[in-house]
Every structure is written in C-alpha cells, then in structure tokens.
A protein has these predicted regions:
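Residue-level detector of functionally special positions within alpha-helical transmembrane segments
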Residues: 85-88, 128
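Predominantly long cytosolic amphipathic alpha-helical stalk/bundle segments
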Residues: 1-86, 98-110, 137-168
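Hydrophobic alpha-helical transmembrane segments of polytopic membrane proteins
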Residues: 121-135
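Membrane-embedded alpha-helical transmembrane segments of multi-pass integral membrane proteins
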Residues: 91-94, 98
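Ser/Thr-centric signal marking residues that sit
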Residues: 79, 92, 125
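Hydrophobic alpha-helical transmembrane segments and adjacent short intramembrane/lumenal linkers
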Residues: 107-121
C-alpha cells in the first residue's frame, strides 16, 4: 500500500510536538508546495519553476534551523575541551609554587616536604585532563554526527524536490 504525500503530511503535522529533522524539512517543503499549488485563480497561479523554488527555499530554511539546533551546544564542548588542560596547568603551577614555598621555610629539604605540593600539582593536572579528554571525544563525535546528518538532509531535500517536480 503506497502512502501518498498528503497522508504523510497529515501524519507529520498531526502530532502534538513540532516535527524535527527530516520531518521538519518535509513539512516546510510540502506546505509551501501545497500553498502555491492551491492558488485560488488562474491569474495568481505560479509556474512550476516558481513553485519548486518556493519549496526549495522553505526546505532550506527548515534545514538551517535544524542544523542550528544540532550545533547549539558544540561550542561549549569545544571550550571545555580546549580550556580544561590550561586550568589543569594552572593548578600544576600553583601546586609546584606551594611546594617551593614549603621548601623555603626549612633548612633541609626532604621528599616528605616536597611531596604534598607535587601531589597537589598532579591532581590538578589530572582533573584538567579528566574534563578535557571526554569533552574532546564528545565534541568530535557530535560534530561528525552533525556533518553526517547535514549530508542526509541535503540528499533528502534533493530527492524530495524531484518527487515534487514530478507531482507538479
């Protein structure tokens, strides 16, 4: 049983939630297509190329909104991934400074005097890396997913434009 575009459109728009992803792109393109095809009089009807261009523009606008939504939190992950090692480095420098400060107050330096400051420095380094590594991995994964979805959305828009072209 073949599903018509009208039934698919009804299914997409019948939900309580706003469509997302390809459904949003489909809704925008088909809504514009229907609007242009159902012009009331013959004088105001548009030719096929204008109808198709209107549908393409509507799909492109929906596509851009979808990509904006997908990209919204990537800058935060990028910032965490790039800044965290520097915060860890700052903690390392602070810990080493404390270790040297502790040495300056004693006549003879021993490992037991230096070790707490160095341990503090290494903990700060580890915390910075603990935050940075997962953030960079997550950023790369999500950025790659956004790129793949972008290609899929563009392919969908081209294929759907061809379907609408045959319907006009």
């Amino acid at each position: 049983m073949a599903i018509t575009l009208n039934k698919l459109y009804e299914g997409v728009t019948a939900g309580r939630r706003k469509p997302q992803g390809m459904a949003s792109i489909f809704e925008a393109g088909f809504k514009e297509f229907i609007r242009h095809k159902q012009q009331p009089s013959m004088e105001t009807k548009m030719d096929v190329s204008d109808v198709m261009e209107g549908s393409r523009r509507a799909m492109r606008a929906a596509y851009n909104r979808e990509l904006d939504d997908l990209d919204a939190h990537l800058p935060f992950l990028a910032s965490v991934g790039s800044v965290s090692p520097y915060i860890g480095l700052f903690g390392t420098v602070w810990g080493i400074m404390n270790a040297f400060r502790g040495l300056s107050n004693v006549a003879q330096a021993t490992l037991s005097l230096v070790a707490p400051g160095i341990a503090e420095a290494l903990v700060a380094t580890a915390i910075g890396l603990f935050a940075a590594i997962p953030a960079v991995i997550a950023y790369n994964r999500f950025a790659s997913s956004v790129d793949r979805l972008s290609v899929r959305y563009e392919s969908f828009m081209e294929e759907f434009t061809n379907i609408l072209q045959r319907k006009s």
